[in-house]
């Protein structure tokens, strides 16, 4: 089962594509991505790069459940789901390749009927 609740649509030549309402996520092995950019780019895998991937959930319970699924799939929980300084609820995990993911719910967001994330009006 997919961690984010959406199964991958397809995998092609080592790239996994996940279609979400209004966007796509493409997961590509870091070595292959570096090679695609330039054979002269070294692959560095330690520390925090300053970049996270974020996924907005529909509820606090969804945040907890997604983090649990990530952990069951082998992810390392970095920050357990909790209330945030900005009024939301989020947690972080590091995936098997070491990328950091934030799973968050915020009171200022809402989902449209077709699943697109929007800012609430007058939020």
Segments predicted by a language model, with ranges:
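Residues in well-ordered beta-strands of folded domains
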Residues: 26-28, 54, 104
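Short coil/turn motifs at secondary-structure junctions
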Residues: 32, 58, 106-108
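Vicinal oxygen chelate
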Residues: 16-19, 39-123
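Core segments of cupin and vicinal oxygen chelate
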Residues: 1-34
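A short, acidic/glycine-rich surface segment
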Residues: 34-40, 110-112
């Amino acid at each position: 089962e997919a961690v984010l609740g959406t199964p991958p649509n397809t995998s092609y030549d080592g790239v996994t594509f996940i279609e979400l309402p209004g966007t796509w996520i493409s997961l590509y092995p870091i070595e292959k991505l570096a090679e695609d950019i330039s054979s002269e780019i070294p692959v560095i895998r330690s520390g925090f790069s300053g970049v996270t991937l974020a996924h907005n959930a529909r509820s606090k319970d969804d945040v907890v459940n997604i983090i649990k699924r990530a952990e069951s799939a082998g992810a390392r929980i970095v920050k357990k789901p909790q209330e945030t300084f900005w009024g939301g609820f989020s947690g972080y995990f590091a995936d098997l390749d070491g990328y950091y993911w934030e799973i968050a719910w915020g009171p200022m967001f809402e989902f449209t009927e077709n699943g697109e994330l929007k800012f609430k009006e007058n939020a």
